[in-house]
Amino acid sequence: MSVEIGLTFANAGESSQREFWSALEDGGELLAFATSFTGQTISDPRLLHEAVTHPSCVSKPCRSYQTLEWAGDAAVCLAARNWLFHRKEKLSVPTLVVLESTLTSNQSLAYIGHLNGVHRVIDHRMSELPSRFESYKFQLKRGLWATDPPKVVPDVVESLIGAVHVDQGVE
């Protein structure tokens, strides 16, 4: 079954969806993964499920990650700016802008997501996505900036951070 952590949900049947919801309601492995990844506990399981649901899951009873990704994008940028402001205050603004762009780029976020297994928890209905994850893994051997990561990974990284932001507010 594709419900357990470590597998994507490509073409998962309705029984897998029920098991996934049940695991969410029980706390489940997805909650443990998200807590480990973000360092925060997301108290609303619906937000957690939304954070990993790709738009290809149109028949799902929840929204896709897109709105949480939008919120997470802002939170990631703010966190990067805060980190740079306090640790690199002597750098010029143009240099800070370049560093912020680098820290928040799809390549950087995809790499962080890949290292932490974000690609394994994405609920999707895209048959080509698992092979894109494998291709990305091999592209990394040429260097981070030589990659074309599947956009879904940095999107879900941002949406998980967005879920924390929505669930807990700004701190």
Placement of each model-derived feature along the sequence:
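RNase III-family endoribonuclease catalytic core
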Residues: S2-E171
